[in-house]
């Protein structure tokens, strides 16, 4: 499995540049046998969320897992404290990411699904199969 940021509204354009590089690399190895079985998942960062009708995988997060994710974000120095390219929202990345996943959990709750602290959602990108 490969996970990549599908957040193309990143105000600095970093996520778009990264996904283009990953897709080019995938295209170069498209004939390798393992690639046919590989699942490619896109997640969103802090600027927007997938519409629920696009979601292929939803992963519930417990309160402890939300804290673990926050600590993982802290390990990325470019995402910590004041970001060099925050866009219009001046909050720290982890604050926006937590709000995004908590709002997603509320949407699932309103649909009658189980209630969770947060939900991280992914869209599967089908490349070669």
Which residues are covered by each model-predicted region?
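Metal-dependent de-N-acetylase/amidase catalytic core
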Residues: 1-129
